[in-house]
Design a protein with these regions (language model features):
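Alpha-helical and His/Cys-centered functional microenvironments
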Residues: 9, 23
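Short hydrophobic targeting helices and cationic amphipathic motifs
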Residues: 17-20
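Glyoxalase I/VOC metalloenzyme domain signal
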Residues: 25-65, 69-206
Length: 206
């Protein structure tokens, strides 16, 4: 529950009590189990900035819905899960493409470039092995109808794409989710930016 929601629910007296402890809530950067990805965040930001520059991608006006990790080691996934539960709450856990995908609602957002991101996606390992386990993509919300998501996202990209970049389209869907979630991803094989028409919170609530 975010601060304004808590104030509304608890009323003035309860909000005053809550305010006394709110600033003591744990930020992800102080969690022992997350120190590997805390240390990596600045590197990820630098790579993301270069990625945007190469594509001349001007997307700062769009909401960064979430940031996602990747890993192939189950022990790493479990450690990250334990860590995020100390600085947020589990919003959702769904089976998508045969593996669990966890979404964490953070009490304090993570700063990535000019975005404040308070949702982290943790996909559990599948069959792939990665050269690197850590931050993988940022997903942005394009506020358009689902049926034109692909066209709208491609309009933001240069044509043709620079060498080494590729585009992939998909439609991930959890077992209980009703909203369509068409997704377009552009990647250089290391960093990925994805676009979809709804926030993950909207999709989970559907």
């Amino acid at each position: 529950m975010k601060r304004w929601q808590a104030f509304k629910t608890l009323g003035l007296f309860g909000a005053n009590l809550l305010h006394l402890n709110w600033d003591n809530m744990t930020h992800f950067s102080s969690i022992v189990e997350l120190q590997d990805i805390v240390a990596e965040l600045a590197i990820f930001e630098q790579k993301l900035a270069r990625f945007k520059q190469r594509l001349n991608l001007n997307v700062e006006q769009y909401q960064a819905d979430h940031i996602s990790l990747r890993c192939h080691d189950i022990s790493v996934a479990e450690r990250w899960r334990k860590g995020f539960l100390q600085c947020g709450s589990l919003m959702s856990e769904s089976i998508i493409n045969g593996r669990p995908i966890c979404l964490f609602d953070l009490e304090h957002p993570i700063t990535v470039l000019n975005w404040q991101i308070d949702c982290v996606e943790l996909p559990y390992p599948g069959k792939k092995t990665y050269l690197h386990q850590g931050w993988e993509h940022v997903e942005l919300v394009l506020p358009v109808a689902p049926e034109i998501l692909s066209t709208a996202a491609k309009a933001l990209l240069p044509q043709p794409l620079p060498t080494g970049f590729s585009v992939k389209e998909s439609q991930p869907k959890g077992e209980q989710e009703r909203l369509p979630n068409p997704t377009l991803a552009v990647t250089d094989g290391e960093i990925t930016v994805k676009f979809h028409p709804f926030t993950l919170r909207e999709i989970v609530k559907s």
